[in-house]
Amino acid sequence: MANTYLTRTQVAGNRQIFTQSIWFKLTSTADQVFISSYNDANNYNCFFLESGNQVLQVLWKKSGSNAALLNTTRKFRDTSAWYHVVLAVDTTQGTAANRIKLYVNGVQETSFSTATYPNQNESIEVNDNNTNQRIGALNTDTFFQGVASYVAQIDGTQELP
């Protein structure tokens, strides 16, 4: 399963407000992409486990620049544990830190080694009918290694766990 993933063609939807959720258990602490929307190398978004530091990372690329980048300070390297991660997004919020909320096992992550939030009203690749959404991969080179369950995306609302 090291090079397999699910893909779906997205339909036009709300590109500013949405929630993504996944339950997962790691089998490796290498780079792990959970959910991504990929247009090209300069325009994509994903959230994943970054292997160098074993931190969760939210990364949005727009025209080759980081439109958003969050790296947790907390480490995620327990291959025996199940994690529930919720990414709650609302770029219409006036306060930058409210535009992306990341929860792990019901607790909001508030400590980040890097915290670059998107501009207010930023639209990203999620719910864009010109991009492919992938569960378990970024493009065709970084794959999820583990077990995933109950992957969900909710359009138009920033839900809490």
Q: What is each of the regions a protein language model found here?
A:
Residues 8-10, 71-77, 122-123:
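Beta-strand-rich interaction surfaces with strong enrichment in secreted/lumenal proteins
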Residues 59-84:
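Short, aromatic/His-centered strand-loop micro-motif at the edge of beta-sheets
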Residues 2-3, 94-96, 101, 110-117, ...:
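Extended recognition patches within non-cytosolic domains
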Residues 125-149:
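Extracellular glycan-interaction patches encoded by glycine-rich segments
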Residues 20-22, 80-91, 102:
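Short tryptophan-centered beta-strand motifs in secreted/extracellular beta-sheet-rich domains
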Residues 43-45, 65-72, 107-113:
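Surface-exposed loop/edge segments in extracytoplasmic proteins
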Residues 104-131:
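Short, solvent-exposed beta-strand-to-loop segments that form ligand-recognition rims
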Residues 2-59, 93-96, 157-161:
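Extracellular glycan-recognition modules
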